[in-house]
Amino acid sequence: MVKEAILYEKLSNNKVRCTACARYCELKEEQIGLCGIRGNQNGKLDLFVYGKVIAGHVDPIEKKPVTHYYPGSKIYSIATTGCNWLCKYCQNYDISQRRKIEGTDMTPEEVVQTAVDTGADGIAYTYNEPSIFIEFARDCGVVAHQKNLFNIFVSNGYDTPGSVKMMGEFLDTITVDFKGSAEPEFIRKFIGVPDPQPIFDTLLEIRDKTKIHVEITDLIVPQVGDSLEYAEKLCRFVYDEFGDRKSVV
């Protein structure tokens, strides 16, 4: 179903600015954002994939990967179509880059009941970037908490203060998955993102403004995204901003 988004601003001349991710797409009437699932219809921003689940699987939590939050638990993983990144090597390309709105119609209550029926301990919003369908994820997440399930995002971290604030309403854990250690040239050439800085800003926003458990991964792409220099910079950032230096000898 189509539902009006929450994370957006109205501009002049019936234009809108999406604030779900750091692209901040400004859209005229009938224009669709880069993600392919949020668009301007009659001067309001609609989410075209609300309740459209393109994939649903039960996974071990470690597959997300999440390794320090309820290890050994089972997760019901869901996704919609679309993504705000254009990774040329994407493993889930058929989902993330699909430009046709498809999927099984499911209400938040049905998503959660499916998770319960499969014996899952929580729900992961994954396979594509969940921040672009965050309004649907939030509604699922609220119901999930009522059923004593936890919620996980597997995210590229290219988010905004507004999306982080909404995450804080329902999210228990987030894995922010860096690509190529956020080397700027790699990010621009292979992902279509002009600047990786919003990822770092998102992590600090989550740390400072929420109680969400954070895990960080880094996808190394051999030959094109394997800079040792930027891997060291990323490690230094994690150590300086998230490390418990008192425990380091």
Residue ranges with predicted function:
Residues 49, 57, 61-64, 85, ...:
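Membrane-targeting and insertion segments and their boundary/processing signals
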Residues 108-246:
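Conserved AdoMet/S-adenosylmethionine-binding subsite of the radical SAM
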Residues 95-105, 146:
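A short alpha->loop->secondary-structure connector
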Residues 1-79, 93-97:
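N-terminal [4Fe-4S]-dependent radical SAM core
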Residues 79-82, 86:
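Short pre-active-site segment immediately N-terminal to redox-active cysteine/selenocysteine motifs
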Residues 39-41, 82, 157, 180:
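Non-catalytic surface loops within mature trypsin-like serine protease
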